[in-house]
């Protein structure tokens, strides 16, 4: 791990703005943090990189940056995980634009990062990020010579959704696959406890994770169990719990289990929910049991449409951020305010599971089940129609 420190006296002044963070400290990428410097006459740049021996390259990249942005009074930190010079330059430009104008809203949910998703979904200027000015990196990753991220891959805070106070957590999809480590899990658990203590009406979880972080497996599993316990406390307190699973990682492993404890789940066509992924099953049991390269099969087993058809989830939407926002608003209006976790609700869930097991018989995936039980949907090629056609055919729109 190399560290480079640069100090410049630059001619231009820039309006002081709150701290911003752009990019992800994932493989081939980097995190850029910009905040006001204590010395308004100087700009300081610190580079932390896992790739050694490229001081001259960094010197050239930083020199070009200060030529393009000769502003004093900034403190800039780069946490690099092997980004190429063009990527570094791009992230620095994006960070400067964000520092000056704020986080941009994104139309595509999957393309947005964790912060952009929050800012694109919640009411304008309503989000307050917790621990923004605090560094909360993993204590384990540096021991493995892996780059840390200052927020450990999850953004938490409070906001308003259609005027309703909410707590919200958003997983950073590109930081080790949105995986749950010690700090990552503790932040989610702390947010849940905050919502209970302050009696917030709802918690929104923007889930995009492959599950527990393998590098922190034991503490990650503990965090999953603590989050589940806190969610059950939340539901018993009458706080609505809503999960949005519309990202490329889906919800697998411990996060897949957590998703099953929430009141209301929203998915799109690209979503996947499971415990063990197709690649894991193939590695353990062989390709004859599960061919992970058969992508249509993978989505018929784990996919958002399958989960919606099986009533595992309550809301189906598109990849557009505004459609997902509308789905969240619908969930907030649909869910009752009374506590949702009681004996009757548990018995009803068990009854539904028994019916599902009985109807499954020897079917191995949803396509087979539809062919035997819902021929009208099977004949319409339900997995390949548009989102609008899918909702119309399933009679579960809005």
Language-model features: where?
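N-terminal intrinsically disordered, cationic/polar leader segments
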Residues: 1-103
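Short Pro/Gly-enriched beta-strand edge/turn motifs at strand-loop
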Residues: 11-17, 134-144
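Conserved mixed alpha/beta catalytic, RNA-binding, or beta-rich assembly cores of soluble enzyme
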Residues: 15-17, 22-31, 44-47, 51, ...
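Glycine-rich anion/phosphate-binding loops
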Residues: 55-57, 148-153, 178-193
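Amphipathic alpha-helical segments at domain termini/boundaries
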Residues: 101-136, 283-398
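N-terminal short beta-loop-beta anion/metal-coordinating cradle
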Residues: 145-162
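A structural preference for short, pocket-lining loop segments at secondary-structure junctions
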Residues: 161-172, 186-213
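Conserved catalytic cores of soluble enzyme domains
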Residues: 210-341
């Amino acid at each position: 791990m190399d560290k480079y420190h640069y100090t410049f006296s630059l001619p231009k002044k820039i309006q002081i703005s709150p701290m911003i963070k752009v990019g992800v400290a994932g493989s081939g990428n980097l995190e850029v943090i910009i905040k006001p410097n204590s010395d308004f006459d100087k700009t300081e740049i610190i580079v932390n990189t896992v790739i050694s021996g490229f001081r001259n390259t960094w010197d050239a990249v930083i020199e070009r940056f200060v030529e393009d942005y000769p502003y004093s009074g900034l403190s800039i930190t780069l946490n690099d995980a092997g980004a190429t010079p063009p990527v570094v330059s791009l992230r620095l430009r994006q960070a400067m634009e964000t520092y000056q104008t704020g986080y941009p809203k994104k139309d595509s949910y999957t393309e947005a990062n964790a912060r952009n998703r929050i800012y694109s979904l919640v009411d304008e200027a309503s989000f307050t990020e917790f621990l923004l000015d605090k560094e909360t990196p993993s204590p384990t990753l540096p021991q493995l010579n892996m780059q840390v991220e200052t927020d450990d891959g999850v953004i938490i805070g409070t906001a308003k959704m259609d005027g309703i106070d909410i707590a919200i957590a958003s997983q950073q999809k590109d930081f080790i696959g949105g995986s749950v480590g010690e700090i990552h899990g503790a932040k989610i658990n702390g947010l849940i406890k905050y919502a209970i203590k302050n009696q917030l009406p709802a918690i929104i979880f923007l889930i995009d994770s492959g599950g527990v972080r393998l590098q922190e497996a034991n503490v990650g599993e503990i965090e999953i169990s603590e989050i589940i316990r806190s969610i059950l406390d939340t539901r018993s307190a009458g706080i609505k719990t809503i999960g949005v699973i519309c990202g490329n990682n889906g919800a697998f492993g411990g996060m897949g289990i957590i998703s099953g404890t929430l009141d209301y789940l929203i998915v799109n066509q690209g979503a996947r929910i499971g415990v063990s992924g197709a690649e894991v099953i193939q590695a353990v049991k062989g390709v004859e049991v599960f061919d992970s390269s058969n992508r249509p099969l993978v989505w018929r087993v784990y996919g958002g449409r399958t989960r919606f058809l099986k009533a595992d989830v309550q809301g189906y939407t598109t990849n557009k951020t505004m459609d997902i926002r509308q789905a969240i608003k619908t969930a907030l209006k649909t869910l009752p305010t009374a506590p949702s976790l009681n004996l009757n609700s548990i018995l009803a869930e068990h009854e539904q599971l028994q019916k599902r097991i009985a109807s499954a018989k020897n079917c191995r995936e949803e396509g087979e089940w539809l062919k035997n039980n819902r021929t009208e949907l099977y004949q319409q090629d339900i997995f390949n129609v548009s989102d609008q056609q899918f909702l119309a055919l399933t009679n579960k729109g809005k």
